[in-house]
């Protein structure tokens, strides 16, 4: 059971690294601003519609940036895998860290949804400025990474990783990511 818990922790770290990579790619084109602009992108039905600069940049990422929609989908899917994997990690006996990671991942997800300025528009949560949502998203994501690394180091101190163990955890992470 200890080795399974360690394997799940390693898989969570690999998912987290992929979340960081896709998030970094998305951050190059994202504009965390609540300023109202007219849409000028490639999607014809929305051309000229007034929207926040953040939502405009999300549409640009989805339609105009090469691989942008794929990166958004991967980022979202990996975040879901991270949350589900954390639940499994908790069931395997890592309660203290798993609950913290799950809570921080929830805060990061809420910050991500808030910074996109699409789902929360018109709700009481839309009163929070978009840069605050984006900052919350980034801070919570960094905190998740710190907790995962601390937990992984403590597990590895008890049971050192082997090359086969790392290969197995990388392979299982790839299978989960590519599963339809």
Which role fits each region the language model picked out?
Residues 1-180:
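Membrane-embedded alpha-helical bundles that constitute the cytochrome b-like, heme-associated redox core
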């Amino acid at each position: 059971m200890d080795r399974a818990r360690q394997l799940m922790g390693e898989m969570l770290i690999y998912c987290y690294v992929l979340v960081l990579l896709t998030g970094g790619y998305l951050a190059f084109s994202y504009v965390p601003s609540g300023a109202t602009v007219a849409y000028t992108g490639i999607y014809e039905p929305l051309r000229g519609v007034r929207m926040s600069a953040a939502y405009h940049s999300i549409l640009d990422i989805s339609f105009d940036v090469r691989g942008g929609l794929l990166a958004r989908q991967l980022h979202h899917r990996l975040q879901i895998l991270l949350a589900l994997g954390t639940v499994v990690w908790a069931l395997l006996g890592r309660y203290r860290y798993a609950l913290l990671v799950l809570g921080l991942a929830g805060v990061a997800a809420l910050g991500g949804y808030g910074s996109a300025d699409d789902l929360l528009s018109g709700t009481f949560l839309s009163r929070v400025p978009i840069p605050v949502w984006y900052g919350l998203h980034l801070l919570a994501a960094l905190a998740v990474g710190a907790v995962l690394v601390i937990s992984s180091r403590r597990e590895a101190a008890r049971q050192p990783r082997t090359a086969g163990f790392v290969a197995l955890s990388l392979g299982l992470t790839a299978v989960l990511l590519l599963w339809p």
